[in-house]
Amino acid sequence: MENAKMNSLIAQYPLVKDLVALKETTWFNPGTTSLAEGLPYVGLTEQDVQDAHARLSRFAPYLAKAFPETAATGGIIESELVAIPAMQKRLEKEYQQPISGQLLLKKDSHLPISGSIKARGGIYEVLAHAEKLALEAGLLTLEDDYSKLLSPEFKQFFSQYSIAVGSTGNLGLSIGIMSARIGFKVTVHMSADARAWKKAKLRSHGVTVVEYEQDYGVAVEEGRKAAQSDPNCFFIDDENSRTLFLGYSVAGQRLKAQFAEQGRIVDADNPLFVYLPCGVGGGPGGVAFGLKLAFGDHVHCFFAEPTHSPCMLLGVHTGLHDQISVQDIGIDNLTAADGLAVGRASGFVGRAMERLLDGFYTLSDQTMYDMLGWLAQEEGIRLEPSALAGMAGPQRVCASVSYQQMHGFSAEQLRNATHLVWATGGGMVPEEEMEQYLAKGR
């Protein structure tokens, strides 16, 4: 972006200056509305989410047999919700900032099959595509026991079709493993940020991995192009897919059930704050949408991004969405948080969700490494760097009197609050890689 343009952008949006300087930045969104007001802009409804629930239930008998690690939950891919009181104390000590309320962790990092939040959206979209093909071919009805999809005739049928996706790692992992298991030929276009172990794991499942020297946006574009030339190839579009988004949104009702099981209350007197790491935006956008449908105006969602990849904060704050990238303002999009190394946000997610998100913040790689170490020490939970992005959120909220006043929170409401950090990945990181992460914390 030439200087004159850049200067006028900064004059209009002074916060951009802090982003360019790679400062850890927090922006509380003045444009938030009620769910009733913001929902029409999403373009999806509660019924769409219910349909996704129903589809995952139909596939549960299949998943329970195809992936024995899901048998205990009857083929439902869901993660634990745990309190992390020792980490809460450690954060308060390190940052000299009390966190009022209780700190919880949602362990999507340990979801079965692919060990990340992408096991929600990625697997769901592959299943939705497989169902559509099998229904159209007359091989399946909605009333069938879907475990029949494990038969050789279905494997044979699906092998005529292929799936392509562009990814920094975790989405590729979930889509690759699921597609290969069901019988599709699958190609994952991996950006330069993708970890070597993720590529190796995919190849071990018979997935074709195409590697790029460039970032996520290029990998997606190349994947899209490659798929266009083959009518039997289905491209899963992380930037624009409503299906992926709905796969993530199912998490809302499921979390509501987990809260009820644990006797946790969310209402006007007991607000819920949720902190979601954000790459291109599909995962956190879908989850936040589901949470809003489940808890209404009593849930407050925040997106967390690396200082080197603040694409969603930049897009929503300036209103330019996918018309601007972090590279346009001179930021390199290089971060240890490989799952969040995205320079241009999803325009679909930004426009759909901008009224339903309370805020956005950035944190440095070093901050993620530090918190990764603290969590391992205090709670014995090991995550990958991206998954710690949410962990900085509770301090930002508890330290901001202006945010609390903007929403009219009383001291008592804050004392009764629940702060939920969404841990997005790390359950499958190899031991030696994890040791390297732990060594970088202070």
Swiss-Prot record:
SUPFAM superfamilies under this entry? Tryptophan synthase beta subunit-like PLP-dependent enzymes (SSF53686)
EC annotation? 4.3.1.18
Signal peptide extent: none
Record field: catalytic activity = D-serine = pyruvate + NH4(+)
EC category: lyase
Q: Does the keyword Lyase apply?
A: yes
The PTM N6-(pyridoxal phosphate)lysine maps to: K118
Q: Name one GO molecular function term.
A: D-serine ammonia-lyase activity
Q: Name one GO biological process term.
A: D-serine catabolic process
Which terms are listed as keywords in the entry? Lyase, Pyridoxal phosphate
Pfam families, per the entry: PALP (PF00291)
InterPro entries reported in the protein's UniProt record: D_Ser_am_lyase (IPR011780), Ser/Thr_Dehydratase (IPR050147), Ser/Thr_deHydtase_PyrdxlP-BS (IPR000634), TrpB-like_PALP (IPR001926), TrpB-like_PALP_sf (IPR036052)
Q: What cofactor requirement does the entry state?
A: pyridoxal 5'-phosphate
Complexes and interactors: Monomer.
Q: Which family does it belong to?
A: Belongs to the serine/threonine dehydratase family. DsdA subfamily.
Question: Which protein are we looking at?
Answer: D-serine dehydratase
Q: Which gene underlies this protein?
A: dsdA
